[in-house]
Amino acid sequence: MDYSFLLIILLLTISTSCCAAPSSYVEEQLRDRISNLPGQPSNVDFRQYSGYVTVHEERGRALFYWLVESPLARDPKSRPLVLWLNGGPGCSSVAYGAAEEIGPFRVGSDGKTLHSKLYAWNKLANLLFLESPAGVGFSYSNTTSDLYTTGDQRTAEDSYIFLVNWFERFPQYKHREFYIVGESYAGHFVPQLSKLVHERNKGFKNPAINLKGFMVGNAVTDDYHDYIGTFEYWWNHGLISDSTYHQLKTACYSVSSQHPSMQCMVALRNAELEQGNIDPYSIFTKPCNSTVALKRFLKGRYPWMSRAYDPCTERYSNVYFNRLDVQKALHANVTRLSYPWKACSDIVGSYWDDSPLSMLPIYKELITAGLKIWVFSGDTDAVVPITATRYSVDALKLATITNWYPWYDHGKVGGWSQVYKGLTLVTVAGAGHEVPLHRPRQAFILFRSFLESKPMPMT
């Protein structure tokens, strides 16, 4: 590769968006530049970067990122920056967000070939995928106890430190329009990180991290309303019996998702048995197998605290990202971790520490602050279903601007939407827990509408 040419390009890019940058920034970007991913298509016309950003020197915590810029023909310098986070907690944004949902490539069944996605979101924005917290994916800590003591608070703080340091490495993105997007348990991560950025931007007229808003999908939001909505969805869709429904309502409403009572765990186990061999993340989709997703579905804790959707494509990602040539191309696993790369960390998820009962106070604060907030939901997800999301949104008591209406894609209903003062709610018909995986075109329309601050199309 002609690194002198890359150096010139990077210098020109940085100089157009900020004053002269020290050469160390350019050197760091050159170090992180992905020249070519094994198996990628030949017609890739966008820049990619990946590597590590240290968030705690003393304990040796470093988070792995993957930046996928917009195609050169779409002028990436004019496009916003979007941080994507997956949930779990303990699941990888590389495994799900990048490889299965919104990234430019999907991994082929041979675990070797990358295929281009027609509705990749980097056509609309520069995408930054972060594996967080330490212990997830390629992100690591040199202090083993960190993997057993992490929780919401540390995850938010480390993610914020990551952003501060990352923007120093990529100063051309400073002051750029910036959004945070995620799904599932990122329903905690996204608003919590947004709150931190908003608070620490106070006093700056032109903050480097120019946060404009956030969007979450099938998001864990409020324990009480998530319980009500989830159990109601199970019962309304014929997934559980009347007696188990009443048992769940009696045993589970008054406890937290982190510390369920024995009675609640019994009720959840009964619900799991009654649901049988279905894919709870997409109830009308044939499950890939009867092992991984189902064994982790309830697992003695609440369903929305488990891992993300487990289609067969995850198997291909596990093969691909554990290849040494792939890790070398991504500048990943530089410390030679003692465990293989996995889509979700059992340790991080099982030993999760703090998890507040509700994100609604953060919503109220950031709505008042004027941030753009969108919430979307695939309507065939039984893990964090649309009913749970609607109960949580209703609890905010927001004034309605545009009442519930069907939105359209080429004359067909793509879902439904309601616009509130300070928040937009969108459903995607036929989509499961991972909306962009099941309905990529409709998810693309949703993302475009969000970025453009336009309501979902009515015709």
From Swiss-Prot:
Question: Which residue pairs form cystines in this protein?
Answer: 91-344, 252-264, 288-312
Q: Does the keyword Lipoprotein apply?
A: no
| Gene Ontology terms: cellular component | extracellular region
What Pfam families has UniProt attached to this entry?
Peptidase_S10
One annotated GO molecular function:
serine-type carboxypeptidase activity
Tell me one GO biological process term.
Answer: proteolysis
* Protein location: Secreted
**Broadest EC class?**
hydrolase
Protein family: Belongs to the peptidase S10 family.
- State the protein's name: Serine carboxypeptidase-like 27
Species name: Arabidopsis thaliana (Mouse-ear cress)
- What's the encoding gene here? SCPL27
